[in-house]
Amino acid sequence: TVDFFIDRVKTALVQESNQLLGADLLIISSESIPESFATEAQQLGLSTASEIKFPSMNSNGDHNLLVEIRAVTKGYPLRGKIQLMSETSTTHGPSSTAISETWEIATDVPPAGTIWVDEKVLQQLELNKNNRIDVGATQLQVTEFIAREPDHSVGFINLGPRIMMNAADLEKTELIQLGSRISYNLQVAGDAEVVQRFRDWAQKRLNKAQRIEGIRDARPEIKAALERAEKFLNLAALASVVMAAAAIALAVRQFT
């Protein structure tokens, strides 16, 4: 019973930590990831989602800003939730810069034809909802403002302004060009043992442009914290066994 409880606590700790990654496992590549990886994961019963990240210069009138664009597919993120500023909390523009702390949970990714922007983009480009801004060769409509993302600042990098869009709109932006700095991410989530099986399978098929990351790989400080927590739980389990043995010994002495 004690071992079962400890295992449940360990599993919960890992799952909570994985929200910082947005998934249980990532395959990251500077090249397009072959469909075979997502197909294998899905055949094992795992959930998948894709994300393509790259820097881009965006503008609104006289305001220009270098941002990180994230083109995502349905299901993103697989762990954690995207928090959006509520409709009444975002009054921003030349005459108003007030932003309240109220927010709501996103239930999907941005619909095709729209984008979501974070607070830095909101402030520096002086945007309001329903503004249309140029994203490469197309225009997309701002429909939501992002308050928080589960995988923001993994490894304490990528802290710049961010725009999220639907991957279905990526081609018409014409932003993916030869020599572009692009990161292709495949998110995977599911039962821990099955995820490990997929990781073992994928590890044998990676090329030099690809790598696998779990939360312990991406965040060394999280790895250290998890290891300390696991040691504490193991000590707690040992202490429980010792206390139970002592209680049994005392009970036996009373009846002998």
PLM regions and their residue ranges:
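Membrane transport/envelope proteins' first extracytoplasmic loop
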Residues: 1-242, 248, 254
